[in-house]
Regions:
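N-terminal leader/linker segments that initiate helical-solenoid repeat arrays
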Residues: 28, 33-75
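Amphipathic alpha-helical segments of tetratricopeptide repeats
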Residues: 56-57, 97-102, 138-140, 178-183, ...
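Helix N-cap/loop-to-helix boundary motif
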Residues: 60-69, 104-111, 145-151, 185-193, ...
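Conserved alpha-helical positions within TPR/SEL1-like repeat arrays
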Residues: 71-82, 108-123, 149-163, 190-205, ...
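Terminal, low-structured helical/coil segments at or just beyond the last alpha-helical repeat
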Residues: 281, 285-328
Length: 328
């Protein structure tokens, strides 16, 4: 787990990456940040968020340089976004950008803030502003000569185009990002994995299921090696591979994969609204597979979870914002 003291002493943010869930389940960032194949639990995420909330109270000029304060607010936005607290994430990102535009301007950090804001807009269904932010982040990185950061912009643009069902554009940018990440020894593992999943999802959108399945199988092997068999990324890979088999017409191969994937996601993601949409797809699959009793049990679980989540105003509002259906 990242040490908060490292941020204070070295003035660096150690992870500003998007969630794999955002990539593959159309806008549900969840399950915690990942760094070097280590996953933060919900408790870890809450604890780190609390630390950064405390730090943000004094993260203003003249108490510290604007760029340092901006990085603290930027990372706080990432933590809020990973927890699904979208409104607070937007406020944190916008405040970070105000700080980061104070001279001397840090172009890499400002581009990161724009990039993160773009992913947040995409998660909440604001695709027009998302595309505007992502393209501006890409232009800023190109103008500043930040070649190592360009693949991340391609990756996030691919994700956005996936939301918009522009599968050809998504495939082009995902392929470009995947090739760049595969050649970069310092690329974060979640970026390597995420681009494979975006690439596979774009192929699913255009009904090229054999090609999608091949990429998902590669992603599953990578996920198992990086994270282990019981962690959220592996559960998501497993579920998506099952989904691709289902849509290709192979319900026999799909069944155990979707069941296992949903079980893993239930253990690692069950606290988050995103899990409702996993269950919804699984219930629909069970209906198609003529497993009516099993489907009914899942549908009852969905109703119970939705009732519980709707009883919490912030989460209930978030459920209305999440636009996961675009992938399915």
């Amino acid at each position: 787990m990242r040490a908060f003291s490292m941020l204070c002493s070295k003035f660096v943010i150690l992870s500003r990456s998007s969630s794999i869930i955002l990539t593959c389940l159309a806008a549900c960032s969840a399950g915690g940040l990942r760094l070097n194949a280590q996953i933060l639990t919900q408790e870890d995420l809450q604890n780190e968020t609390a630390e950064y909330e405390v730090a943000s109270r004094s993260a203003e000029p003249p108490h510290m340089p604007p760029v340092v304060a901006g990085r603290i607010w930027l990372h706080l936005g990432v933590l809020y976004q990973d927890a699904g607290r979208f409104g607070q994430a937007e406020i944190a990102y916008e405040h970070a950008m105000r700080l980061l535009t104070i001279a001397p301007v840090s172009r890499p950090d400002l581009a990161d803030a724009l990039d993160n804001l773009g992913t947040l807009y995409a998660e909440s269904g604001n695709l027009k502003d998302a595309e505007h932010a992502e393209k501006n982040a890409l232009k800023m990185r190109e103008a500043a000569g930040l070649k190592s950061e360009l693949p991340r912009s391609w990756y996030h643009l691919a994700t956005l185009y996936l939301h918009q069902h522009r599968s050809a554009n998504a495939r082009e940018f995902a392929q470009r990002a995947a090739e760049a990440f595969s050649e970069d020894r310092n690329a974060l593992p979640e970026n390597k994995l995420g681009t494979l999943l975006v690439l596979a999802s774009s192929l699913c959108q255009s009904h090229q299921y054999p090609e999608a399945i091949a990429h998902l199988q590669s992603a599953l092997q990578l996920s198992n090696n990086l994270y282990g068999p019981e962690q959220l990324p592996t559960g998501l890979n497993t579920f998506l591979l099952g989904y691709a088999y289902w849509k290709s017409g192979d319900l026999v191969s799909a069944n155990p994969l979707m069941q296992r994937g949903s079980d893993i996601l239930g253990k690692t993601l069950g606290w988050h609204p995103a899990y409702l949409f996993v269950l919804t797809q699984y219930a629909q699959f069970l209906r198609k597979a003529h497993q009516q009793d099993a489907a009914h049990a899942i549908e009852q679980e969905i109703k119970q979870k939705r009732t519980h989540l709707n009883s919490e105003p912030k989460i209930g509002q978030q459920l209305q914002m999440i636009d996961i259906a675009v992938l399915f």
